[in-house]
């Protein structure tokens, strides 16, 4: 087969011409070669480059780094808040609330208890602790309110003067309700004992 091909071609190899562009030859310029390339519109170029990226970006980064360092230094220099009875009461309340949810709630991987007595005992203990913690927080708020009224009497007087009309109206409503209750009780007693107070013994 190869012999037949050689016989047909006359034993000579034919070279195929290849057109390879030669850059830089013939006096051609690179601008002439790239002249047909599409240009990027000015609007797209302006939108693709963020404003302020060409100038001042390095200064902004340095200023941001300095501000972050100053903020972290100020946070480190701040003194911790002194512990108070109110803070301790709130921490205790949150702790017992989380304990109540953790001990009472049951998730899928955790097997349920074999008896309900265990759940009942745990719920009673956790609810009692949570109730005591709530009472402690309420008492602490009440104590702080009374302490503020004693230490700042003039501020308390100003607040009372602002709400004086409402306080008077509230007291009048309470007195009217008490009068109606007394009259109703007297009427019930007179109906039950019609001869009460009419016979005198000597």
Swiss-Prot record:
This is Coiled-coil domain-containing protein mdt-28. Interacts with mdt-6 and mdt-30. Plays a role in normal growth and development. It is found in: Nucleus; Cytoplasm. GO terms for cellular component: cytoplasm; nucleus. Residues 1-15, 28-45 have a biased composition (Acidic residues). The lineage of its organism: Eukaryota, Metazoa, Ecdysozoa, Nematoda, Chromadorea. Keywords: Coiled coil, Cytoplasm, Nucleus.
């Amino acid at each position: 087969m190869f012999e037949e091909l050689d016989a047909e071609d006359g034993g000579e190899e034919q070279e195929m011409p290849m057109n390879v562009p030669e850059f830089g030859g013939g006096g051609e310029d690179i601008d002439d070669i790239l002249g047909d390339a599409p240009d990027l519109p000015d609007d797209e170029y302006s939108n693709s480059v963020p404003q302020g990226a060409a100038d001042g970006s390095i200064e902004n980064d340095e200023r941001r780094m300095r501000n972050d360092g100053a903020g972290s230094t100020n946070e480190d220099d701040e003194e911790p808040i002194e512990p108070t009875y109110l803070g301790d009461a709130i921490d205790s309340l949150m702790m017992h609330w989380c304990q109540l949810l953790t001990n009472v709630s049951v998730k899928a991987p955790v097997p349920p208890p074999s008896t309900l007595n265990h759940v009942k005992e745990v719920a009673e203990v956790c609810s009692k602790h949570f109730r005591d913690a709530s009472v402690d927080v309420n008492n602490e708020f009440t104590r702080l309110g009374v302490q503020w009224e004693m230490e700042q009497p003039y501020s308390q007087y100003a607040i009372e003067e602002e709400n004086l009309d409402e306080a008077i109206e509230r007291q009048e409503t309470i007195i009217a309700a008490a009068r109606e209750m007394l009259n109703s009780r007297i009427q019930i007693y007179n109906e039950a004992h019609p001869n009460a107070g009419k016979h005198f013994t000597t």
